[in-house]
Amino acid sequence: MSADPIGPYSPWVEAGEWVVTSGQIGLVDNVMVDGLGPQCDAALSNLGLRLAEAGLKPTDVMKTTVFMVSMDDYGVINEHYVAFFGAHRPARSAVAVSALPAGALMEIEAWAYRPVVDSERQEAVL
């Protein structure tokens, strides 16, 4: 599965203890998959890839923003979102928009927290 950026932006950046992902859409091998459910799964899988690249996992996500082309899709998106995050519940905003890149039906971006470890104490500094 590919999650290569389709524009002039970084797939994720870090600033101190924070990692911020760009929006992830339902591309597989740079081709948009058909249907809302498969797009949700692909976008969330791409998000997981971005988190893993940064050494993080879904439970490190503190905030997401979900964009959708129809608020009628909210319930279906929630089902796939819960399947990805499990019991973890990041803060979230959900926004209906008129269109998304590459014909996407939904897009998700995330803010994840990675505590700085104090090397002398070998524990997270919170």
Language-model regions, residue ranges each:
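Short, polar/acidic, helix-capping and beta-turn segments at strand->helix junctions
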Residues: 1-126
